[in-house]
């Protein structure tokens, strides 16, 4: 297709400016001078244009120029196509824009490339997805020294097409060394592994944890070329932690190259010393914990039945002290208040650890990265994250282990105020309760406070520094006194013993804590998309009932203040804006007409699933299936985004119709 003369001139000008900026002419002169020198030295034939182009290609100059010349695709041509053609291959619905990274030449980098995947035998029988067909996908998440990365999703297969690279900065945290390029000896002392978390997303959008692996990267320090290839075997999680789920072919490269490499003997010696040091610290803590437990049982034999949890298993079934699951976590500018942090934790999905077969509850306290990447977990995962965030906000926070109704084991969070006030935080709902103890020795005529919280008994409390077991005569929460400094009521563990195995860097086996990531979701776009999908679903549902549907866009818009008010109340505990909402609805509904509204809250963005849930409510079904004179329907969706792709989705269905009775 020929360009108009003015467009051709403009294009030539752009190319000329780009070539001038890149100093391509200077590079050509250098290559030409070099080629002429080689020609005179070899006394060959006259240098041709082909020889010059060959030399330019060999030096990568042609490729460099072509990469710099970007031409934007005309979007208008795509917008004219009303019905897109079916895809002939898997399409990533969330395409990632390639961003240029500012590489600091004074820092050392580890380039981790995932070249391919093999032996994912669970997907051996799966055929390639048909054109336009939705398929399950794998996503790989990485964390290394406060840096987080996420691969593009690839279709699940026996040999998934993983082809991703991640540039990890290798640096020291200590002041003074942070700005200096790390040498081989310094990097050998950095025992932080690269944590890999593999997720599977099914066709309905549900995410499950496939594997959690800690990659030891320091073997690259002993290679002369600064690069090494590894075969990483991924094991399952929970009860399948001994079963291989697949293999990743990984390549590690250091940039820039090391001036001096280390011998493999030195590297192996360092690994051995770290393992021995870790094993000895863990052994000493275990010996201390056993002695502490014997002392606790000697106080009162009935203590044996209390929920005093010292160790917990992670997703790889590794036993770790519960205090190691907590660490003060600052959310930067992603969360502004402790209550907003509680709301964020509340909207993360709740899912009990999966089990194979029947029996009791499967225990699995996930590492923080696995919990955040999956965006759902058990109540212990929620409590550990909430406690860490509250500690980051400067509160004196603890995780409580006990029971709620019917003796079911449960965990929640407690904060102790400077004035002695005790507040309970329910991580799964975001609710807060003030604790006022009941004195069982008071006479019957004395009015006692009625507890509003659902908790029945408490066995222990802990955070990253302290672990205390309840040694009061009764373990009922309502009569407990939470004076944690009173050793006659709370038996403490040695803070030094806890620090030896739970403080950052104390042992090599301690998983590092990742930072929170901001949401990549666009709230307005998501709200519009879900609302349109719900309108289609309502239309189809009423059509099946033989009913016509007329939407009232103005009424739909007027529902927005109510949804905003509900979210503010969930976040702050303060109800606001209800008077204005009632006033505008009264004005929008004429005399003699009836208005009905049904709000509902979700923590997922699946419109079909949400609609099915709404229909199970008789009141909502009455609105959606409403019959009447001048009947108008309305629906409003509002998505509130939080860190880590978490979101609160508020939906409100409403109708107005003329009363004929």
Swiss-Prot record:
GO terms for cellular component: centriole; centrosome; cytoplasm. It is found in: Cytoplasm, Cytoskeleton, Microtubule organizing center, Centrosome; Cytoplasm, Cytoskeleton, Microtubule organizing center, Centrosome, Centriole. The keyword GTP-binding does not apply. InterPro entries: CEP76, CEP76-C2, CEP76_C, CEP76_N, CEPT76/DRC7_peptidase-like_dom, Papain-like_cys_pep_sf. The keyword tRNA processing does not apply. GO terms for biological process: regulation of centriole replication. Keywords: Cytoplasm, Cytoskeleton. SUPFAM superfamilies: Cysteine proteinases (SSF54001). Its main location: cytoplasm. Belongs to the CEP76 family. Centrosomal protein involved in regulation of centriole duplication. Required to limit centriole duplication to once per cell cycle by preventing centriole reduplication. This is Centrosomal protein of 76 kDa.
